[in-house]
Amino acid sequence: MFLKAVVLTLALVAVAGARAEVSADQVATVMWDYFSQLSNNAKEAVEHLQKSELTQQLNALFQDKLGEVNTYAGDLQKKLVPFATELHERLAKDSEKLKEEIGKELEELRARLLPHANEVSQKIGDNLRELQQRLEPYADQLRTQVSTQAEQLRRQLTPYAQRMERVLRENADSLQASLRPHADELKAKIDQNVEELKGRLTPYADEFKVKIDQTVEELRRSLAPYAQDTQEKLNHQLEGLTFQMKKNAEELKARISASAEELRQRLAPLAEDVRGNLRGNTEGLQKSLAELGGHLDQQVEEFRRRVEPYGENFNKALVQQMEQLRQKLGPHAGDVEGHLSFLEKDLRDKVNSFFSTFKEKESQDKTLSLPELEQQQEQQQEQQQEQVQMLAPLES
């Protein structure tokens, strides 16, 4: 079934937003991945897809948010699903129309740049090399920081395992009272260190976005002399490039955060296992503590190996996108699917607008409800005063 194809997307979204409200970016990501998968499927397969599948995916975002005292998530879900379904149905029509418009735009832009094809290609190549030079230090720093933070995390947690083994040897008669505080402290230390790790790694994505803005602006200036009467079309193409590159930066941040949360979820059961064995026999506890240090090292090392290449992979993706721009603007572009990034940008803009409007209305509704609450309080006070006045003659 097609839903299996988006399990990874939903899992990443769920981990990244497990402690926060459902966001516009999460909703747009689910919608875009769903649309992309439909576009990539054979027509026969698409015809068999149930229209309810998008609704199921969106509802999955809310499954952990419903049932709370705050009704925000429930109200948002009721209004969002119909909006998203209608917006998705329009995407296919908008896609064909936009593809035609972007195709014409690129034709005019290529025709204008054709007399300067070699110079344009050279400028983009120069800009590409400058981009690589700017990003390489940050990718190296990210790799180093991942290794440093992983080692620091290991150094922070390993002593707890060693300390609990020592306490086990010295306090065999009162294990629960002696070890429980250490097991609780280990769990708290895991949470604290994972949050610190995320705080040190995720800002690199923002640094990358700053460099993207600088690079694209320099490219705009270098190509401007060759596109004097088609500057607006060139700007539009560069906006699409910027969107793609910054999307990669946001995905990098989300992947780092999701990997850190996955590390937390892998480490937490180790502390819980120790706490659970406190109620069992000494032999089981000894085995659990003996294996704890090795398990901690293993999970931290797996995190390091998985996350270290993120920076280099991000750089490669940006280089590829810059090369695609050079191909689109070149004389031998062929049939390039250049409209999809603009379609996705439009989708995300519409979803962001929906969320902004919804939150503004929610805020207005809360503001309007305050006078009603005050009026109810005044009525209650008047009723209490009337009751006191009615009782006064009886007391006399």
From Swiss-Prot:
Sequence repeats: 33-54, 60-81, 82-103, 115-136, 137-158, 159-180, 181-202, 203-224, 225-246, 247-268, 269-286, 287-308, 309-330
Lineage top rank: taxon: Eukaryota
Gene Ontology CC terms: blood microparticle; chylomicron; collagen-containing extracellular matrix; cytosol; early endosome; endoplasmic reticulum lumen; extracellular exosome; extracellular region
Entry keyword annotation includes Transport: yes
Localization of this protein: Secreted
Effect of T367S: In allele APOA-IV*1A and allele Budapest-1
Region (Disordered): 361-396
Pfam families per the UniProt record, alphabetical: Apolipoprotein
Tissues/organs with expression: Synthesized primarily in the intestine and secreted in plasma.
Keyword field: Amyloidosis, Chylomicron, Disease variant, HDL, Lipid transport, Phosphoprotein, Repeat, Secreted, Signal, Transport
A biological process from GO: lipid homeostasis
Implicated disorder: Tubulointerstitial kidney disease, autosomal dominant 6: A form of autosomal dominant tubulointerstitial kidney disease, a genetically heterogeneous disorder characterized by slowly progressive loss of kidney function, bland urinary sediment, hyperuricemia, absent or mildly increased albuminuria, lack of severe hypertension during the early stages, and normal or small kidneys on ultrasound.
Described purpose of this protein according to its UniProt entry: May have a role in chylomicrons and VLDL secretion and catabolism. Required for efficient activation of lipoprotein lipase by ApoC-II; potent activator of LCAT. Apoa-IV is a major component of HDL and chylomicrons.
Domain notes per entry: Nine of the thirteen 22-amino acid tandem repeats (each 22-mer is actually a tandem array of two, A and B, related 11-mers) occurring in this sequence are predicted to be highly alpha-helical, and many of these helices are amphipathic. They may therefore serve as lipid-binding domains with lecithin:cholesterol acyltransferase (LCAT) activating abilities.
Subunit structure: Homodimer.
Annotated family: Belongs to the apolipoprotein A1/A4/E family.
Protein name: Apolipoprotein A-IV
Native source organism of the sequence: Homo sapiens
